[in-house]
Amino acid sequence: MDWGNVTVDDLFDALREVDWSSPPRPPSEFFSRFTVPKSVPKWDSRLKCNLYYYRTNYFIMIVVILGLGVLTRPLAIFAALLTALSLAFLNDSFAGSFSEKATRTVRRFSPQLAAKMRPPLTPVTRGRPSSKRAIHVCGQPRWVFVLTCSLVSFALWYISSGLLRVSVALLIAHLATILHASLRTPNLKARFNTFREEFRAVWRNYSEI
């Protein structure tokens, strides 16, 4: 895959749709080899490749840095967790998995309520979905959960007076992510993994037809 031809929008769409349940790469691979890119196009391609391949590692690193920044403020810790949850809901795989597990848990106690938590059916025309299926969480549009978690987390940030700390922590976390993604040399395993996930995505789209 030529990452130089991948736009920022394509990268965000891929990160939104890809499965994030895969475990992070081992530290021996994550901190293996670093080199300075020889040109701006090579840097651009390397940055996108590493952001996609090491996405779970970067997410954990950002959460850890945020946690260290608000360690002495309990309310800020809850705010950080809600912020991470609101961002996680933007991923299709996480939102669907969370909704399925929550519905399955509620079904044990109240089957009627669990039935209301199911996503609405997508209209079908000539055997195919008439439109792209919208993501629902517990029967509600995804944006409801994203907006709720974001508003509550912002209120907790404000109450705990941790906005300055979290801003500095976020800045450090993002700089560390960009620095690592810029200097980490992509290996053959990363390229092979990209091709494999591309094949899975194509096969999944083909099976839905």
From Swiss-Prot:
Its main location: endoplasmic reticulum. GO terms for biological process: vesicle-mediated transport. It is found in: Endoplasmic reticulum membrane. The keyword Membrane applies. It holds the Pfam family PRA1. The keyword Ribosomal protein does not apply. It comes from the Eukaryota. InterPro entries: Prenylated_rab_accept_PRA1. Keywords: Endoplasmic reticulum, Membrane, Transmembrane, Transmembrane helix, Transport. The chain crosses the membrane at residues 51-73, 77-99, 144-164, 166-186. It is a multi-pass membrane protein. GO terms for cellular component: endoplasmic reticulum; endoplasmic reticulum membrane. May be involved in both secretory and endocytic intracellular trafficking in the endosomal/prevacuolar compartments. PANTHER family: PRA1 FAMILY PROTEIN, PRA1 PROTEIN. Belongs to the PRA1 family. This is PRA1 family protein A1. It comes from Arabidopsis thaliana.
